[in-house]
Structure formats: C-alpha cells, structure tokens
Amino acid sequence: MNSLPPSTSAVSSPVSSVDSPLSAVSSSIGSPGVPGTPSIGYGPISNSQINSSMSVSRLHAVSSSDDVKPPFGLKSVSGSGPMLSQKRMCAICGDRSSGKHYGVYSCEGCKGFFKRTVRKDLSYTCRDNKECLVDKRQRNRCQYCRYQKCLAMGMKREAVQEERQKNKERDGDYECSSSANEEMPVEKILEAETAVEHRTDLHSDATGSPNDPVTNICQAADKQLFTLVEWAKRVPHFSDVPLDDQVILLRAGWNELLIAAFSHRSISVKDEILLATGLHVPKESTHNLGVEAFFDRESSHSAEVGALFDRVLTELVCKMRDMQMDKTELGCLRAIVLFNPDAKGLTSSSEVELLREKVYASLESYCKQKYPDQQGRFAKLLLRLPALRSIGLKCLEHLFFFKLIGNTPIDTFLMEMLESPH
C-alpha cells in the first residue's frame, strides 16, 4: 500500500494528494488491515466465529462453581496498601474502582465479569501455567486467572446470588428493564455523548471559510477524531475489551460514528450540515464543490458528492428530526456501531457481540419507559443503521476524513489516545 505524501495542513490543503481513505486506516501495529468492503452487520453472529487452536493438553479447566485457591505466585493486597488509599483502585486489575462490589473494591469491568461468571456458572481454561498477569491492560487475556484473582481478592459468589434473588422478588417488567440497564446503563451512554459534546463546544470556532466546504469538513473531522476516541473510552465496558481490539473496533466504525454524530447535530438546522467547528455547510455548496479540482479525477465526483450529501439529509438528518431522536438514543445507536463483532481481526468477538446485545436490550427498555405510546420506536431507531452503513461506505469512497492528522496513521494515533487517561 502506498504511503501518504508529506502532510500539509488540512486548513491550507485538505486534499492535496489523495489515496483511498482506507489507506489512512491501514494497520501500523500489526493488526489486520480493513478490507475494501468490510462486512459489518447489526444482527447476531454465529458462535462458529470463535475458533480455538489450543492444544487440549495445555488447558486447565475450572468451573465458576468451585472456590479456587489463589494460583501460585498470586500475591494478595495488603489492607494498608494503595488499594485503600483515597483514590481506591480495583483489587483485581488496578483500574479505577467504582465502589465495593461483592465484598471487594473493583472496577465495573471486573464486577460485571464476576457477576456473569457466577450467574451463568461459566467454566474457563488457562492457556499457560495458571499464573497469567491480570492488570488493566491484560485483564481480558485469561478469564481463568481473572476469575481466580476475583476469588483470591475476596469476591463472594453468594453476594451475586443474593443480588439476583432480590431482583427476582421485584415486579417482572421492572426487573427486566432494571437488569438490562444495569448491564449497559443508558445514563452512562448519555454521559459519554454530553461529555464529548461539551469538549467540542469548548474548542469550536468559526474562523474557517464557509465557502470552502471541503476545508471545513477536513477541519471538523480532525476535531471529531480526537473526541471520538474520548467518547469510546467513556462508553460502558469498551475499556474492558482488549486494547488491540479497541483499535480494531474504532478503525472499523469511525466513519459511521462521526456521520451519526454530525447528522444528529444537524437536526436543528434546515438543509445544512452543522460541523463540530460550529460552521454550517449548506446543501447548495455541496452541489457546486468543483471537487474535480481537489481529487484530480472525473468531474462526475461532484454530482456524486452532492447526491451523497442529499442522502445524509434525507435518510439520516430528516428521519432523526421527524422522530425527535434524543441524545440517549443516538448514543445507543453509536454504541451498537462501535461494538461490531464482525470487525476483522477481533480476538474477543464473542465478548463484543455480548456487549452489542446489551446495548440492544438497554435501548429497547429505554424506549418502552421513555416513549410508552410509541411501540414501534425501537424498530424505527434500528432502521437508521443500514442507511448509516451505506452512507458511511460511500463517504469512504469520496470525501470524508482523509489526512486527518498529517502523516500519523490512524491506528497509531488511536493507540496513543486509548492508552492516555481521560
């Protein structure tokens, strides 16, 4: 694959030399590249995707119904150590604790992992010698050792069972909705949307030329890519996915995620797209882009870009406006796009699929509670996903989001952002 030419400012020359936008997302960390026409669906996938080539003789089975002793080399945490400092850390992986869960200060990821393990009575295997490191970065690498560490640190199986019994005693409908929201809280999804929105507002400006939509879009894309990573890190359980898979998921869905965001932002204006920079791109300007000057290709691109802009307005912006889609629903749709179990190269496809199913359940529960008179609202929301997918592929072919941050490949940039704190 040809490398991009030396970078110039997106402001002065947003498209000075253009390869396929997919070249910007080619792997620089050894991850599989993104195919030209990736297959990303929104339905369930088959468990046959999860294959194992491990030797049976190297696997050590353990059932969650057994209280397993700490493995060799696993050190306990002193009660006077940093785990009980003012900023409590997860006793399992060292991430930030969200409180005491099942008897131990732990993060949401380890809490959810332990609860799922106990409730479903899952059995795990270790590929190595039962001494795998369990920390923030590698907690998903070995479920066997992670579960052992949960027990070693003092998590109580009976606490999970008591919690489940209490839930069963509640009203059936409430229990169902409460359980779904507990697994994937829509409040946290909304917080992710609003946190990024506020950050965008702080850094937005209107100094660009409203007569140069290509430059404006490139400027906005640069800002949105920064905020996209921050948004993803705030989505519940995304940080629980292995880091390499986080990069794969963002690389597979970044175009659809950004399109969904600016489409929803544009429902307050008519026949325009409202960019993250605060600038408006009117419909008329996209039909007179003269993009052949930018792309050095056939002039037919100009008409195609104008038609693509019309699709964004009619299939996304107008539909969102007509149904008055709120930010919680937008956040859930974007989370569904993010948790894509069909993304090529994933090592945790089944876990990602489970997270997507939890978003589905939480969104459906939210629609029933918030809009009880609109029985078809949940289905109507999901119908926006195929249109978003189709438009996203077209955008990759034509106009959006190339040369976003100079010569830095997107994979490397995403890796740096994901490793940085909030």
UniProtKB/Swiss-Prot annotation:
Residues 161-182 are annotated as: Disordered. One of its GO terms (cellular component) is RNA polymerase II transcription regulator complex. Its main location: nucleus. PROSITE patterns: NR_LBD, NUCLEAR_REC_DBD_1, NUCLEAR_REC_DBD_2. Pfam families: Hormone_recep (PF00104), Nuc_recep-AF1 (PF11825), zf-C4 (PF00105). Shows uniform expression from the blastula to mid-gastrula stages. At 12 hours post-fertilization (hpf), expressed ubiquitously but more weakly. At 24 hpf, restricted to the ventral diencephalon, pharangeal endoderm and trunk and tail mesoderm; mesoderm expression is in medial cells of each somite along the dorsoventral axis, forming stripes. At 48 hpf, expressed in forebrain, eye, midbrain and anterior hindbrain. Residues 156-178 are annotated as: Hinge. Residues 161-173 have a biased composition (Basic and acidic residues). GO terms for molecular function: DNA-binding transcription factor activity, RNA polymerase II-specific; nuclear receptor activity; nuclear steroid receptor activity; retinoic acid-responsive element binding; zinc ion binding. Residues 181-421 form the NR LBD domain. Keywords: DNA-binding, Metal-binding, Nucleus, Receptor, Repressor, Transcription, Transcription regulation, Zinc, Zinc-finger. Belongs to the nuclear hormone receptor family. NR2 subfamily. Composed of three domains: a modulating N-terminal domain, a DNA-binding domain and a C-terminal ligand-binding domain. Receptor for retinoic acid. Retinoic acid receptors bind as heterodimers to their target response elements in response to their ligands, all-trans or 9-cis retinoic acid, and regulate gene expression in various biological processes. The rar/rxr heterodimers bind to the retinoic acid response elements (RARE) composed of tandem 5'-AGGTCA-3' sites known as DR1-DR5. The high affinity ligand for rxrs is 9-cis retinoic acid. This is Retinoic acid receptor RXR-beta-B. It comes from Danio rerio (Zebrafish).
